[in-house]
């Protein structure tokens, strides 16, 4: 049970792990970045020598069973997440 702001009640929610979508090559920021990489010279951003973080931040997607409203909840940093 979780609170749904659209239904304004506590309803059953299905839980899934959020996965990032595919990057769009034609997005303005991506085209700008590709122009900067073109030609001679180095990358506009410094390359990281060693990893500062060893795990990713996990985000859950709660989907309301009544109206289908999706809610994101952050779980913080974890090495492994398993939904049962």
Swiss-Prot record:
Cellular component annotations (GO), alphabetically ordered: ribonucleoprotein complex; ribosome
Binding site for Zn(2+): 4, 7, 64, 67
Keyword terms: Metal-binding, Ribonucleoprotein, Ribosomal protein, RNA-binding, rRNA-binding, Zinc, Zinc-finger
Pfam family, one: Ribosomal_L44
Biological processes per GO annotation: translation
InterPro entries: Ribosomal_eL44, Ribosomal_LSU_eL42, Ribosomal_zn-bd
GO MF annotation: an example: structural constituent of ribosome
Subunit note: Part of the 50S ribosomal subunit.
Family under the similarity heading: Belongs to the eukaryotic ribosomal protein eL42 family.
Stated name of the protein: Large ribosomal subunit protein eL42
Gene designation per UniProt: rpl44e
């Amino acid at each position: 049970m979780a609170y749904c702001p659209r239904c304004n009640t506590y309803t059953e929610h299905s839980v899934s792990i959020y996965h990032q979508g595919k990057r769009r090559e034609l997005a303005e920021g991506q085209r700008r970045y590709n122009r900067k990489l073109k030609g001679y010279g180095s990358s506009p951003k410094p390359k990281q020598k060693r990893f500062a973080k060893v795990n990713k931040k996990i985000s859950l997607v709660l989907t309301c069973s009544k109206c289908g409203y999706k809610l994101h909840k952050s779980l913080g940093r974890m090495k492994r997440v398993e939904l049962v």
